[in-house]
Structure formats: C-alpha cells, structure tokens
C-alpha cells in the first residue's frame, strides 16, 4: 500500500478515535485535524512511531487548511456540532466549514473526499442542524470523487447516546418520551460505520454519491429505552411529552450549563432516522452490520449493579 496520507478533519471525537486507529492499523499516515486536537494513549493503540500528526486548524480557515491537507490522497470530514453555539455555530461548522473543505480539496485535486453527514437531513425542514448539514452536503458534492455517508444514530462504548440514557436512568425515576417516543432509528455500531468508511476509500462511486448507513434493527425511541431498562434491570416511569411541550421544556433546559436537550434536537426527533433502500450501503458494499441488541447488551453490562462510567 505504501505510506498514503489521509487527512481526517474533526478527528478528535468519538467516531474519529475509532476511525483513526483503524486507518493506522492499515498502514496509512494520518493527519488528525481539529480545532483542539486531543491525544490519549488509549486512542490509537495501533499507532507506530511517527505514523500520525495532530494539527490544530479551524475548518473555516481555508488558507491554513490548504497547507494542512496538501499531499493527502483522501480527506474525511467528520465535523458536526449538535448545539448551535456562538463560538461553534451550525453555520460555521457545517456550511462555512464544508465550503472551505470543498475549495481546498479542489485546489489540491484530492483523489477521494468522504463527508460524514446524518440520516434524515434531506427530510427535516425545521431543524437548523438538518438544514445546515444538507447545505454542507451540497458544498461537498461540488468536489470530484466525493461521497456523502449518512449514518443513523451511532453507538459504542464511548458514545453520548446509550451512555447518556443509562446514566440518566440510574438516577431518575422518570424517562421522557418526546413525541411519544415514536421516532424510529436504525442504530449502527461505531466499528461498523468505520468499516464502511474504510471500504469506501478505494472504491469507485459516482461523484457526490449518497450512501445511507444503519444497523439491521429498526426500533423507535421508546423501544430503545424499554430494552435499556430491561438490560439494567430497572423499573422506571415514562412521561409522554408531545413535541410542542418538549420544545417549551427545552427552551428552559437550554439555559442550564449542561444542556439535556435543545429545541433544535426536538425538531430533529420529528423525522425518522432510517435508511432509504435506494441509497443503502448494501447496494454498494458487501458488509453486514452488528445487531443493536447484541452489541448494546455488551455495552450495557458496564452499568449493571456497580457498573457504569
């Protein structure tokens, strides 16, 4: 294979840590690009001496990004924010950031550009997150040899999904069901998403191809919580919060230092998060994802009795 260079933008997070370790295991040299790069010993157990570099760069800084990605044959964009903050807004992270990536990749004729988006962004017309993520997709599609990967909700040992609700359920007798908990998801294990990203690096697709990714199990939010409580052997009470009520509650929760949920996230829950067969990864790649029930069961063992994070 040789020492090919892959630049991973927004590589310091949950998905990035798994992806980068796998890329290192495969022998790539990886440039880890982030506003605030983080290096932890347990992040990259596959790393060899001098096999990766941590680079501080704001994705909106096109001039610096130009220099940083130069020499890369592949650029993977993982940038995404779930809260619209002044210092890191949806507009900056998603729209301006993707414009910057698009310009830099065009300038350097990058051989492969992989943009990680999210399922449902093309259907939800009220969430700022969805609207800006869709605009980001349109920017990246202007680059030759680009693909868009839209995963459903991603889970794994360090996630902010199962871990959040497992911790919440341990201390609260009540669990909220926004919109009655009827929003459907197709949860995908982080290691499966990583394998699909890696399988896409050297595969030829039409420019701007959309690939939707989800696990084999489709279940709604209430069913996910019922499964979680069963695994933790906890009895909790559900509170049904219609979307309009949840939005009002979120308005006040947004004023807390730690935001449990935002109004925009309530808007996102109005759209199901499942794969469209027309763009399913199974049309392009031969790969079987892990069952949510089996993988999540292993993950939740940490929370039983004296377990937990």
Where are these regions (language model features)?
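Conserved beta-loop-beta element that borders a ligand/cofactor-binding pocket
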Residues: 117, 137-164, 169-171
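SDR active-site strand-loop-helix element
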Residues: 9, 33, 78-79, 113-119, ...
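N-terminal Rossmann NAD(P)H-binding glycine-rich loop of SDR-like oxidoreductase domains
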Residues: 5-26
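Substrate-positioning beta->alpha
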Residues: 160-162, 180-201, 209-212
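NAD(P)H-binding glycine-rich loop region in Rossmannoid oxidoreductase-like domains
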Residues: 48-99, 104-107, 119-123
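N-terminal Rossmann-fold cofactor-binding loop
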Residues: 33-38, 58-59
């Amino acid at each position: 294979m040789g020492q090919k260079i892959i630049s991973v933008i927004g590589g310091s997070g949950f998905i990035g840590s798994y992806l980068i370790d796998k890329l290192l295991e495969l022998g790539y040299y990886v440039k880890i690009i982030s506003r605030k790069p983080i290096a932890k010993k347990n992040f990259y157990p596959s790393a060899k001496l001098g096999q990766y570099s941590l680079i501080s760069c704001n994705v909106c800084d096109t001039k610096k990004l130009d220099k940083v990605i130069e020499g890369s044959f592949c650029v993977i964009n993982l940038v995404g924010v779930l809260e619209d903050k002044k210092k890191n807004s949806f507009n900056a992270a998603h729209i301006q950031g993707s414009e910057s990536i698009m310009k830099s990749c065009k300038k350097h004729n990058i051989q492969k550009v992989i943009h990680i988006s999210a399922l449902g962004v093309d259907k939800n017309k009220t969430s700022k997150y969805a609207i800006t993520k869709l605009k980001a997709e349109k920017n990246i599609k202007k680059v030759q040899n680009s693909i868009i990967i839209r995963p459903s909700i991603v889970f794994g040992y360090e996630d902010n999904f199962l871990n959040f609700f497992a911790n919440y359920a341990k201390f609260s007798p009540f669990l909220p069901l926004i919109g009655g908990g009827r929003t459907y998801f197709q949860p995908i294990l982080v290691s499966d998403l990583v394998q699909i990203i890696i399988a896409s690096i050297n595969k030829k697709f039409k420019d701007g191809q959309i690939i939707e990714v989800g696990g084999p199990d489709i279940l709604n939010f209430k069913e996910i919580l019922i499964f979680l409580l069963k695994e933790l052997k906890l009895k909790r009470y559900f509170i049904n919060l219609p979307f309009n009520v949840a939005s009002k509650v979120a308005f006040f929760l947004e004023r807390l230092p730690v935001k449990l949920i935002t109004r925009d996230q309530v808007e996102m829950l109005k759209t199901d998060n499942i794969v469209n067969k027309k763009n399913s990864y199974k049309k392009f790649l031969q790969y079987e994802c892990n069952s949510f029930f089996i993988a999540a069961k292993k993950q939740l063992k940490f929370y039983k009795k004296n377990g937990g994070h």
